[in-house]
């Protein structure tokens, strides 16, 4: 697919699929269960007349396990590969997760990922901009994207996504490499809505770039299943984040209670909604706001079972009324999340 085709396929999406939590955990989800969920995502996307979107990572678990799952899935279901757009993160040290954005490191990351996945990758993204390589006055290292452009010319990847970038970086990279850019991946949820206030979302709208919204369920906070730090399994990185300490949760869960009591519980039985569906609906409702009409907000929840996929990908259920959307945003003006996105306890 050309970059234009990739952008068009992404723009058709309502919801994409994040595969990180299948493997980046103390005990990976068994392949058989993961494959059922992955297959259901493709099935639902087909029914809606567009490709599925798989968001994967070179470092989402040891020994390329995340990419191995994708490789084995398509080995089992080869006819489904044409129905999926794969976006892969790399460009980092797989052990320490520090950015490795040199030309040779990025080329090697792409080649490692292509080898692990078993072939062509539609979209590749350096997970974090390696600012250690920037010379004075630069906001991103040219060589990282020069390497990706070479990989596109060699036909091993199709386009570039940006990841965890700021407004200045988006503009600079778009100026130099815009013909290769397909989308921008950043965090957006009711607990982390910075992109709506720091210029990122407005810049994407101005430049016509879709916004891939990771962690739309607040890393589990918006599922209703987390009540205390003890609910987080040992070995899960969230356990050591300030946002998920018991003291922080007491304050952060006030938002969840508001959503449950003022939105979920007040819905009639014939139009029920879950907390997760509400959270996804809030992200997608920004597509109705005129100032963002040039972009497309696409949440990429996970889903380790068919039932979770069905819940998260129910496009009729994951909708809010304008009144609900406005009530939530009014509440958010006085609510402040305790703990930054990656702040340790």
Swiss-Prot record:
Identify the catalytic residues: 60 (proton donor)
Q: List the disulfide bonds.
A: none
Q: Which domain of life is it from?
A: Eukaryota
Key words, A-Z: Cytoplasm, NADP, Nucleus, Oxidoreductase
Record flagged with keyword Transcription? no
Under which pathway is this protein filed?
Cofactor degradation; B6 vitamer degradation; pyridoxal from pyridoxine (dehydrogenase route): step 1/1
Its EC number(s): 1.1.1.65
Q: Name one GO molecular function term.
A: aldo-keto reductase (NADPH) activity
Its GO CC terms? cytoplasm; nucleus
Q: Name one Pfam family in it.
A: Aldo_ket_red
Q: Which reaction does it catalyse?
A: pyridoxine + NADP(+) = pyridoxal + NADPH + H(+)
Q: Which InterPro entries match?
A: Aldo-Keto_reductase, NADP_OxRdtase_dom, NADP_OxRdtase_dom_sf
Q: Name one GO biological process term.
A: vitamin B6 catabolic process
Keyword NADP in annotation: yes
Q: Where in the cell is it found?
A: Cytoplasm; Nucleus
- Give the family from UniProt: Belongs to the aldo/keto reductase family.
Q: What does this protein do?
A: Catalyzes the reduction of pyridoxal (PL) with NADPH and oxidation of pyridoxine (PN) with NADP(+).
Q: What else is known?
A: Present with 2190 molecules/cell in log phase SD medium.
Annotated protein name in UniProt: Putative pyridoxal reductase
Origin species, per record, is Saccharomyces cerevisiae (strain ATCC 204508 / S288c) (Baker's yeast)
């Amino acid at each position: 697919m050309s970059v234009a085709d990739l952008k068009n396929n992404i723009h058709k999406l309502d919801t994409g699929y994040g595969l990180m939590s299948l493997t980046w955990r103390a005990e990976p989800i068994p392949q058989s269960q993961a494959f059922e969920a992955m297959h259901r995502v493709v099935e639902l996307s087909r029914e809606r007349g567009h490709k599925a979107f798989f968001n994967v990572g070179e470092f989402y678990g040891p020994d390329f396990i995340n990419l191995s799952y994708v490789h084995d899935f398509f080995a089992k279901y080869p006819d489904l590969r044409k129905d999926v757009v794969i976006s892969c993160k790399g460009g980092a040290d797989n052990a320490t997760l520090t950015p490795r954005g040199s030309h040779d490191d990025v080329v090697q990351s792409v080649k490692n990922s292509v080898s692990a996945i078993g072939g062509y990758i539609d979209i590749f993204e350096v997970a974090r901009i390696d600012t250690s390589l920037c010379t004075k006055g630069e906001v991103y290292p040219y060589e990282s994207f020069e390497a990706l452009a070479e990989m596109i010319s060699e036909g091993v990847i199709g386009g570039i996504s940006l990841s965890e970038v700021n407004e200045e970086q988006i503009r600079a990279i778009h100026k130099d490499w815009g013909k290769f850019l397909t989308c921008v991946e950043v965090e957006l949820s009711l607990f982390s809505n910075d992109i709506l206030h720091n210029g990122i979302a407005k810049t994407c709208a101005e430049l016509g770039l879709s916004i891939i919204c990771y962690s739309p369920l607040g890393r589990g906070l918006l599922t209703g299943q987390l009540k205390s730090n003890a609910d987080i399994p040992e070995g899960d990185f969230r356990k050591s984040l300030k946002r998920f300490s018991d003291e922080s949760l007491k304050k952060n869960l006030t938002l969840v209670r508001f959503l449950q009591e003022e939105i979920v519980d007040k819905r009639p039985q014939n139009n029920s909604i879950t907390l997760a569906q509400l959270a996804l609906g809030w992200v997608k409702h920004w597509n109705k706001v005129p100032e963002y009409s040039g972009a497309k907000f696409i949440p990429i929840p996970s889903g380790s079972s068919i039932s979770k996929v069905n819940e998260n990908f129910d496009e009729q259920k994951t909708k809010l009324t304008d009144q609900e959307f406005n009530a939530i945003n009014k509440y958010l003006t006085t609510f402040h999340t305790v703990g930054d996105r990656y702040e340790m306890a």
